[in-house]
From Swiss-Prot:
It holds the Pfam family Arm. The gene is Ctnnb1. It comes from Mus musculus (Mouse). Glycans are attached at residue 23. Expressed in cerebellar granule neurons (at protein level). Expressed in the intestinal epithelium (at protein level). Abundantly expressed in the tooth, skin, lung, kidney, eye and brain with weak expression in the liver and heart. Changing residue 8 to P: Loss of interaction with VCL. The modification Phosphothreonine is found at residues 41, 556. Residues 156-178 are annotated as: Interaction with BCL9. Residues 34-57, 720-781 are annotated as: Disordered. Key downstream component of the canonical Wnt signaling pathway. In the absence of Wnt, forms a complex with AXIN1, AXIN2, APC, CSNK1A1 and GSK3B that promotes phosphorylation on N-terminal Ser and Thr residues and ubiquitination of CTNNB1 via BTRC and its subsequent degradation by the proteasome. In the presence of Wnt ligand, CTNNB1 is not ubiquitinated and accumulates in the nucleus, where it acts as a coactivator for transcription factors of the TCF/LEF family, leading to activate Wnt responsive genes. Also acts as a coactivator for other transcription factors, such as NR5A2. This is Catenin beta-1. The lineage of its organism: Eukaryota, Metazoa, Chordata, Craniata, Vertebrata.
Amino acid sequence: MATQADLMELDMAMEPDRKAAVSHWQQQSYLDSGIHSGATTTAPSLSGKGNPEEEDVDTSQVLYEWEQGFSQSFTQEQVADIDGQYAMTRAQRVRAAMFPETLDEGMQIPSTQFDAAHPTNVQRLAEPSQMLKHAVVNLINYQDDAELATRAIPELTKLLNDEDQVVVNKAAVMVHQLSKKEASRHAIMRSPQMVSAIVRTMQNTNDVETARCTAGTLHNLSHHREGLLAIFKSGGIPALVKMLGSPVDSVLFYAITTLHNLLLHQEGAKMAVRLAGGLQKMVALLNKTNVKFLAITTDCLQILAYGNQESKLIILASGGPQALVNIMRTYTYEKLLWTTSRVLKVLSVCSSNKPAIVEAGGMQALGLHLTDPSQRLVQNCLWTLRNLSDAATKQEGMEGLLGTLVQLLGSDDINVVTCAAGILSNLTCNNYKNKMMVCQVGGIEALVRTVLRAGDREDITEPAICALRHLTSRHQEAEMAQNAVRLHYGLPVVVKLLHPPSHWPLIKATVGLIRNLALCPANHAPLREQGAIPRLVQLLVRAHQDTQRRTSMGGTQQQFVEGVRMEEIVEGCTGALHILARDVHNRIVIRGLNTIPLFVQLLYSPIENIQRVAAGVLCELAQDKEAAEAIEAEGATAPLTELLHSRNEGVATYAAAVLFRMSEDKPQDYKKRLSVELTSSLFRTEPMAWNETADLGLDIGAQGEALGYRQDDPSYRSFHSGGYGQDALGMDPMMEHEMGGHHPGADYPVDGLPDLGHAQDLMDGLPPGDSNQLAWFDTDL
């Protein structure tokens, strides 16, 4: 059959008028039917359109060749001869396309292929038959491989057990080659004797090549569940663990990847690896430098440590925390960083590993990756930092981490914001440097904005409020922070959090924050205008009722509601009202809510810190003559006189101040006796001071801050939210109080609460006592 070039040569030889007609047609934009040019009137074999073997040829290529012309011409007889050759070899072309192996060697067959990049129709039609042929061949070869392996396995098993190490080496090489083919690989794994021989040879050989081949064979088998089971049953795990001590990198790679496959897919493999000492060997391998090898090793450690405390302790004893932190600090390979962060996350919930990771610089190392493009890496680092952060409150060099965390508060990812808020809450607890740093990088504004955005998502609002509570207390920037919350429109949302649907942990944190905000006089009026005082009183009454009810039923232990003791709420609300009462207008509101009888009752509390805040708020209220008279009318003189002998200096001082203010309109003789009593009580441990002071001579009204909380007061501790840090320089103490000591607890009245007027009508809005606990828990997940 003629080629396309031949056909064009023939057309050139046609009569001039026809050639001119065709050229004229090519230069026109209309479509030619062929009537005038004769373009479609030639025989099918000459037109190039009737042959099913030929492809449609690109017109541009034809035109280009046409314009170039041809150097060779063909006669009509030559064309007929060429056409005959193509017709005679059609069967051979089909056979060559479908069954090329049937052709005689050296046979030349004319090709109809014009463009080598485009197969002819026959070639394309032959593809399925070729695929079928290859499938049949593969099936035959597979069967041959399986039969060969089945026949060879018994003999190879004997050779692997031979005493001659040269023979063993040759057998190991042959078995390794067989394991690379699927059919023979299945035959090997179905022979327990062969697998046992491979394991035994690998474990006992001193030859590097033999160890490499046997380990490679087990690696190939481990890609199948049947192979994993065969390795496990043959005692392969102890042998593979032993191979982790090999100095040969290829053996190490085969061993760790095989163990990795076993840990992932074979039941019982984890315990077997632990019993074989695999954890210690794997930790020792963390000093290698191949990042892909390290990624597999760290993933093995994560699988072994997850949910297993003993494994975590073994990793700790083997120096794992330091090695893992070094990896996080050194490498940039994302998969390695991700697998390593997963191990650290698992270890970070272990109370023993946690300080070790922190001491190794884990906080700073993890902080390096918080801006990584990999979201899975960032999330793992944040989870780990969150778990570690309560043990890192004394760490230095956290400036970079704190700045990044403040930036992450603006993230659109809820998980990122939740973790960042929790970490900031813990890191700002009891660490004045961290507090100042967060304030200086805009932390107050970011946290207020976070609370505003969070709405009723307490997993975000609780840590954010706790962080604000820490930042508004006991450091050089505290007053600025107290003002900043107001300036960034935070007071309305803070007071709103005292109301439903807030649960007790969040309410407790919010009460502490309000207490700190009240330390700034500029916040007194805004807090009052937002309705903070009535709500604090409502919460106080509700919590006190709870403790009263339990006491009347004979209960001795403090009850937790959603992880919060009601005694903590009593102390927190009373402490906040104490600071708010420094403002004369606030005192009027507090007194108007008929709270004095309740404060007097709290003087009988068996908890020393509740006694202190109750005496403190009475001290502020007693500045007003009307309130002082009401306090005395409620019978406060007896408990206050008793509290003069308290071992807590703050309690005794406040009690003395209240008694002194109550005596201002009493006769001079009464004042004299009271002064002597107060002096003897307050200076009972300082005889020289007693001798030097015949009279108190205290101007209670001018004392001001002297009656506030003192930094050197040993009983001064924190009001903190469970799990979000405990700022000992923040709110009044609310945990682990001394239940004993000298106090009038036996006389504590339990016969109901005083009427609080309109405040009582809103009590139904308080959170229920049996809501699910929202405290923070560390988990492996």
